[in-house]
Regions:
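A hydrophobic, multi-pass inner-membrane permease signature
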Residues: 1-26
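Intrinsic, low-complexity polybasic segments
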Residues: 9, 29-31, 40-50, 54-55, ...
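Positively charged, low-complexity intrinsically disordered leader regions
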Residues: 99-167, 171
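Phosphate/diphosphate ligand-binding glycine-rich loop within oxidoreductases
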Residues: 141-143, 147-253, 375
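Glycine-rich phosphate/diphosphate-binding loop of Rossmann-like nucleotide-binding domains
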Residues: 159-171, 256-330
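Rossmann-like adenosine-cofactor binding region
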Residues: 307-382
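Adenosine-phosphate binding glycine-rich loop
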Residues: 364-365, 371-411
Length: 411
């Protein structure tokens, strides 16, 4: 008994002395709990008995289980995944047996009215949107306008600065023979405290056919949709950016010729882009690896849900994430309204994508950035302006994906 107690004391001592990569595993779930706004944080324990503690290189989620890959040949610790709650739409948990988009037979239909997030979409619905975007791009290249929105008017309710989202929607609606009205949140009664319920219910009474929101939080966007009689499209929230990631998947499909059995590595802040990439990539059978500093990793709830569909790697090690990647992706370090966060800038500064980082990926890997780009901060100019960059293709495809969403949602 004394020997056992002494051994446990030694184990506890070295676990406590280990570096920031020390992670705790708990029976039935991972003990890494949110440090900032529901994100994974280091050395934070859930109220349960620990299985073991060890220096870890990365945290790897593989379809329903969590695996800690450790250094120096230490065996991996496995835990069963704990149920993390239901999907907004139960059908979203269904993954088609054939995950090859090139073998999918599109119907060009969606069974839903709104597009609020990738968590809600089934894999088939993602494929439907991507095939519709492909058709829209073909018409665009042939300079053929569509009449799908003739007699329709779409409201763009925006609350912050926008270039790609606003221009792509305005031009897309025009190219589909529709009309739009641009509403700045500050110029509506929402800025003076009018309820979301009243605003959402009222807009449908004026003959609008859909509303694109880029002004509300994730919770407010879902609340708005619950009161609206017309389709609601999430342009962006602090938690998700579904249209951007649909555009990214479409771009990868174009460049790589497939989506399944690829690996995407995201480097930087675990923000709304990272959250949506995890969900979107997992649902099309694409592995995704996220390299973020502790306290800035993606939302835990998103990672747990994505475990139902595919493999997710969460790490603070850039090399581990980028190794053998087909796509390397990053986003701005500082989001809107965070410009004065000097601590965040300092912490993320070593997560810059450089030519040396790109060299760790596959030779034919491509670089992606959702823009705007801050050269010298999150990415070196040689990378974003180099031959591996497909950022402008990515940006153009926002137009075609937005048109696809409108075509399938607006009746």
């Amino acid at each position: 008994m004394f020997v056992v107690s002494f051994a446990l004391s030694i184990l506890y001592y070295f676990a406590a002395k280990s570096n920031d990569r020390t992670q705790q595993f708990l029976r039935g779930n991972v003990s890494i709990l949110p440090k900032r706004k529901g994100r994974f944080g280091p050395r934070e324990r859930a109220p349960a008995a620990p299985l073991r503690a060890m220096p870890a290189e990365r945290l790897f989620f593989r379809r329903g289980s969590a695996i800690m890959n450790v250094r120096r040949g230490v065996p991996r610790a496995r835990c069963r995944r704990t149920p993390c709650g239901g999907e907004t739409d139960p059908r979203a948990a269904r993954v088609p047996k054939n995950m090859d988009i090139n073998k999918y037979d599109p119907k060009f239909k969606l069974r839903r009215r709104d597009l609020l997030g990738l968590t809600d979409l089934t894999s088939e619905e993602i494929f439907e949107l991507l095939y519709a975007a492909k058709a829209m791009k073909k018409k665009f290249r042939m300079r053929e306008n569509s009449t799908l929105l003739r007699g329709k008017t779409v409201a763009l309710l925006f609350g912050n600065a926008s270039t790609r989202t606003r221009v792509s929607f305005e031009m897309g609606i025009r190219q589909m023979s529709g009309d739009y009205i641009y509403l700045s949140k500050d110029e509506t009664q929402l800025s003076r405290g009018e309820s979301l319920k009243d605003t959402a219910a009222m807009l449908g009474r004026y003959g609008l056919s859909a509303v694109v929101l880029r002004s509300l939080t994730e919770t407010q966007t879902h609340e708005f949709a619950s009161y609206s009689d017309i389709p609601v499209i999430n342009g962006i929230t602090e938690v998700s950016h579904p249209l951007q990631i649909l555009s990214d998947l479409f771009t990868i499909w174009e460049v790589k010729g497939r989506l399944d059995n690829l690996k995407l590595a995201y480097i930087g802040d675990g923000n709304n882009i990272a959250n949506s990439l995890i969900m979107g990539c997992s649902k099309v059978n694409m592995d995704v690896a996220i390299a973020s500093p502790h306290g800035y990793s993606p939302a835990r709830s998103v990672v747990e849900r994505a475990m139902q569909y595919g493999d997710v790697l969460i790490t603070d090690d850039i090399a581990a994430a980028v190794h053998d990647a087909d796509v390397v992706y990053t986003d701005v370090f500082i989001s809107m309204n965070e410009e004065d966060d000097e601590e965040k800038k300092h912490i993320l500064s070593r997560y810059r994508v450089t030519p040396e980082v790109m060299a760790l990926a596959k030779p034919d890997a491509v670089f992606m950035h959702c823009m705007p780009v801050h050269r010298g901060e999150e990415v070196a100019a040689e990378v974003v302006d180099g031959p591996q960059s497909i950022c402008y293709d990515q940006a153009e495809n926002r137009l075609h994906v937005n048109k696809a969403a409108l075509a399938l949602l607006v009746k």
